[in-house]
Curated annotation (Swiss-Prot):
Belongs to the L/F-transferase family. It comes from Bordetella parapertussis (strain 12822 / ATCC BAA-587 / NCTC 13253). Its EC number is 2.3.2.6. It comes from the Bacteria. It is found in: Cytoplasm. This is Leucyl/phenylalanyl-tRNA--protein transferase.
Length: 254
């Protein structure tokens, strides 16, 4: 089967036409404009390609999904989260989880080369595209700060009542998992059932993610993305999933 090439005004083909090998490859071409990305994610499609390649669009079957109700932190992480919850409202707390206070830095850290990987798909062009989408209010960072330093976090796409996880990083033990746990609490508070994890990995499976048939995934997001947007704003995120303004900086609440 010949891979469809998308011009600027070409719609995506049906996801059922995606290749089986490589699994989920649907089309190539087009661009990473906010409008094109919104169209893609709303239909269960995402871009993934190496720098120097044309843009490749994917919709694998099955799809890796973390149901928020099935999030399964390890015993040691649960213990650490309980300890954090006891001190999180203390202004002097060493560890704090925030939303959208350092999006560009999170994106940059997620794009850094990983051990055992030859490169990264989060190229400068991808970073620019998602930064533009963040400015439009559809991409968000969840950040773990320790002693005033960014220690880990993740970013993802939010459409309606659906969240699409993109990438995460950690510079300290459990830092990205702590951010994920707080994100799950926020999403559950706002009746978001699933986080799209895109592809199957052992790391995500250990946290409770499971593969679901693509048809079921598409059926779910068709309803979820049509729901009202979540109340995202920059601030501190507590373990119950509530957002709070940051402490005053020069007398101004953030």
């Amino acid at each position: 089967m010949k891979l469809p090439w998308l011009a600027a005004d070409t719609p995506f083909p049906p996801v059922e036409q995606a290749l089986r090998d490589p699994d989920g490859l649907l089309a190539a071409g087009a661009d990473l404009s906010p409008e094109r990305l919104a169209q893609a994610y709303a239909h269960g499609i995402f871009p993934w390609y190496a720098e120097g390649e044309p843009i490749l669009w994917w919709s694998p079957d099955p799809r890796m999904v973390l149901a928020c109700a099935d999030f399964a932190p390890s015993h040691s992480l649960r213990k650490r989260l309980r300890a954090l919850a006891r001190t999180e409202h203390d202004p002097a707390a060493r560890l704090q989880v925030r939303v959208d206070t350092a999006f560009a830095r999170v994106l940059h850290e997620c794009a850094a080369p990983r051990h055992g990987q030859p490169g990264t798909w989060i190229s400068p062009a991808v970073q620019q595209a998602y930064h533009s989408w963040h400015a439009a209010g559809f991409v968000h960072s969840i950040e773990t700060w320790i002693d005033g330093e960014l220690a880990g976090g993740l970013y993802g796409v939010s459409l309606g009542r659906m969240f699409y996880g993109e990438s995460m990083f950690a510079r300290a033990t459990d830092a990205s998992k702590i951010a994920l746990a707080h994100l799950v609490a926020f999403l559950r508070r706002h009746q978001v059932a699933w986080i799209d994890c895109q592809q199957q990995t052992g790391h995500l499976a250990r946290l409770g993610a499971r593969p679901v048939p693509r048809a079921r995934f598409i059926e779910h997001i068709a309803h979820a993305v049509a729901q009202p947007r979540l109340p995202w704003r920059s601030g501190r995120l507590d373990s119950a999933g509530m957002l709070h303004p940051l402490p005053p900086a020069n007398g101004v609440m953030m």
